[in-house]
Structures are given as C-alpha cells and as structure tokens.
C-alpha cells in the first residue's frame, strides 16, 4: 500500500519524511551539509513535504536512539553519511540496532567492491572494506556506481521505511536518481508534485515587499514566501499540481500581479542574477562595458566574468586601488584627489569618463569607497561609496550610498557591487536603443 504522505500534510499530527545527516564533521562545521538541501529540493519535486532535518555525530548509541524516535513519528527516513569502511562509519549497524536486527553478508557486494578496486588499481584491506557488505537480511540494496559503499532501502517495521546513502554528494546524487526516485514515486507519491518559480528583486527590502503583498502571503496554493539575501530578495511561488504545466497555470496569475506591482524591482527569475541579466541586455543592444574599480578590488569584474559569454560584452577593468594608479592609469588629476579626496563623486565621475574613453567602451562603471574596517571619519564614514556610470551620448549618473558601519568589509564590497549592477540595470531599462 502506498503511504500518502503529501495528502496528509495538512494534518499537524500526520507522519511524513525526515532527513538525517550523519557525521561528526558536519557538527564541527568542517564541511557544509549540501546533501540535505539537495534532497529537500528533490522531495519537493516529488510532491513530498519533509517536516524535520537532523544532524548527528558518529556515535552508535545516539544514532540508534534517534532513529528509533524518528520511526515513531515519520513514514520515511532518508540518511546520508556513515556507510564507509572506517571505524566511525556506523550508520548501518546503528539502524539495525534500533530494531534488534542482525546483519548478514551479501557476498556479491564483496565481489563488486574487489572488481572496482582492481580496475582503479587501488590496494584494499579486506577487513575494513568488507563491513560495507553487511545489511539486514530483507533490505534492498541501492547500488553505488561511483564508489564502494552501497545504500539500502529497508522497512524494519510496518509504516516506516529507511533509505541510506553515502555522504559523498556525487555518489549520493547518482544513487538517488537511479534508484530512490522511482521507489519513492511508486511507494510514497500521490501523483502530485510541487513546482516553484522564484522572482528576484533588487533595490527594495524584504519588509517593504511583505507589507505590500500581505494578502498574497496568506495563499495556500500557490504559496508565496520571501527570502532575503545580501543585496536582493527572492519571492518563491510554489504550487502543488499534477504536473509542471498545471502548476504554472496556478502560479502565473500571482506572478503577473507581482510583476505589475514591482516591475522596477524585479530583475529576473530562478537562476538569473544581475550579471547574467545585464549581459543579455548588452548583447541585445550590441553594447560594451568596462569598469574602473577601487574599493571593490576586482569583485565587480569577477561578478561579470563568472557568467559564460561575458567576453562578448565585457572588455575589461582597471583596478586602481591606489591614488597613484588613479592618476597614471585613469588620468585622474592629482589636484582633484587633493581637493575632494579619492572617495568622492568628482573622482568617481572622472574615473568613469576616462575608463570609457581609454578602453573604448559604450558604458563604464566606476566605484570608489571606504569598505573598512578603518579609514573612515565623521565626514566620510566607513560604508561610504560613490558610483559613477558613463554611457553613450554623454550619459552620466552619479550615485552616493552609505552602508551601515555594522557591515563588515566583504559585505560592504558585495553590496557595492549589487548597487553598481542594479543601478546600471535601471539605466538600461529606462533607455531604449
């Protein structure tokens, strides 16, 4: 019988799906737990909600106790980590212990491991690697095409199933796609999926957006959820439907309403970022772009060159961090720097105009500021940034921003890049070629 997890998800007392990440290295912060995030997205795609994530260290007693607790409140548990050959790989043994089960050797798995290692030319220790061949007798094995640690699908008690995967992301993902997806669809899906479409905003805060769309935040299908990142806000629209086409039909009316309300602030969707959007627009306009950077030290250039195809529109950048280079490379007069300071509208404007001319570009963006933590004063505090954008037909836009002094150096630099790119986006949006 299928476990109709999603159908029951509106019941606060219902059972559901849990993710358990196993490994002391996760608790110590030695590695980032990307597996749980990836599996969460996969579960949503399959139409399943998971209600809890846990992380636990490599301790058999604690793992066993937690799994027993999970079995009383969930239908499906997905674990990652602890399937390797070392003494601290304890997942399978701990799971078996939770249900007083014994482990038996699967001889064919040992043959597979030896074959894989002989092909790769690796030496192997029989005593350590062989522990990966022991499973509960009625467990279904999940083959590992990329490594030596198989996983399993096991139903130790009625109404509770465990899927185990290694902690190596590349191995886990391939095993998931080859085995877990079909198994979950066949045994736990009610035929519905979750589909999400994310709108991305810049130049407006999360609280302002939330105030304006308070009624939309109460919707049940689709749901509307805001998320704030440094310099941008995301609105995730999620619908539950039989397929993606139906889900889009549910989402689209809400999306169009949001686009009408926030047309100036929405710069893209899903995988878009400000750099990719700007590159597409410049390609369409057949225009080029250069930078003259000071306080961002190349971060602005990096944001553009990280996008494939950027070389078709981005010519390069002059990183004039010192005053001497501002003078020698960008022809900023020494007396201008002495009179107004390197961090000033006048200097940023001169940097932009001269960079555009020297590098023969349609557009240029220049930035000079105080990223901190030192270097500021009462008149020019840490967080002060001047941006100048020069373009065709004598276009010139000057921008002054003062970011909070509570921001650290990297945050001020990243926010400065965001303001540069978003300001340029708005200029392109308002000008037609």
Swiss-Prot record:
Protein name according to UniProt: CinA-like protein
TM region positions: none
Recorded family membership: Belongs to the CinA family.
Database matches in PANTHER family: NICOTINAMIDE-NUCLEOTIDE AMIDOHYDROLASE PNCC, NMN AMIDOHYDROLASE-LIKE PROTEIN YFAY
Pfam families: CinA, CinA_KH, MoCF_biosynth
InterPro entries assigned: CinA, CinA-like_C, CinA_C, CinA_KH, Competence-induced_CinA, MoaB/Mog-like_dom_sf, MoaB/Mog_dom
NCBIfam families: cinA_nterm, molyb_syn, PncC_domain, PRK00549.1
Organism: Prochlorococcus marinus subsp. pastoris (strain CCMP1986 / NIES-2087 / MED4)
């Amino acid at each position: 019988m299928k476990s109709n997890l999603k159908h029951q998800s509106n019941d606060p007392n219902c059972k559901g799906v849990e993710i358990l990440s196993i490994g002391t290295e996760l608790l110590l912060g030695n590695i980032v737990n990307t597996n749980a995030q990836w599996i969460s997205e996969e579960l949503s795609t399959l139409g399943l909600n998971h209600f809890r994530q846990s992380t636990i260290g490599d301790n058999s007693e604690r793992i066993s106790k937690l799994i027993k607790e999970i079995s009383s409140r969930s239908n499906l548990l997905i674990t990652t980590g602890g399937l390797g050959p070392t003494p601290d790989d304890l997942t399978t043994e701990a799971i078996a212990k939770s249900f007083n089960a014994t482990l038996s050797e699967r001889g064919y798995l040992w043959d597979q491991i030896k074959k894989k290692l002989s092909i790769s030319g690796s030496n192997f220790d029989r005593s350590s690697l062989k522990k990966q061949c022991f499973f509960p007798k009625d467990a279904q094995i999940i083959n590992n095409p990329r490594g030596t640690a198989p996983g399993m699908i096991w139903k130790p008690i009625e109404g509770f199933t465990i899927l185990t995967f290694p902690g190596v992301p590349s191995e886990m993902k391939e095993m998931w796609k080859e085995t877990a997806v079909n198994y979950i669809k066949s045994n736990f899906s009610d035929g519905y999926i979750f589909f999400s479409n994310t709108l991305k905003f810049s130049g407006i805060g999360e609280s302002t957006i939330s105030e304006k769309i308070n009624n939309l935040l109460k919707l049940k299908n689709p749901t509307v959820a805001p998320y704030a990142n440094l310099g941008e806000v995301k609105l995730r629209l999620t619908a539950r439907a039989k397929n993606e086409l139906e889900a889009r039909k549910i989402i689209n009316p809400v999306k169009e309403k949001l686009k009408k309300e926030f047309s100036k602030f929405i710069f893209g969707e899903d995988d878009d970022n400000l750099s990719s959007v700007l590159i597409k627009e410049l390609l369409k306009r057949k225009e080029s772009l250069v930078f003259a950077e000071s306080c961002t030290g190349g971060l602005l250039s990096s944001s553009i060159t990280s996008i494939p195809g950027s070389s078709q529109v981005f010519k390069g950048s002059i990183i004039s961090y010192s005053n001497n280079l501002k003078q020698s490379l960008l022809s900023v007069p020494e007396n201008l720097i002495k009179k107004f300071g390197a961090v000033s509208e006048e200097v940023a404007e001169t940097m932009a105009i001269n960079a555009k001319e020297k590098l023969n570009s349609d557009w240029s963006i220049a930035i000079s500021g105080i990223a901190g933590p030192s270097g500021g004063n009462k008149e020019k505090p840490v967080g002060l940034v001047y941006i100048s954008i020069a373009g065709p037909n004598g276009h010139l836009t000057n921008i002054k921003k003062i970011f909070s002094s509570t921001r650290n150096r990297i945050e001020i630099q990243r926010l400065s890049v965001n303001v540069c790119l978003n300001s340029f986006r708005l200029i392109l949006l308002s000008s037609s070629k």
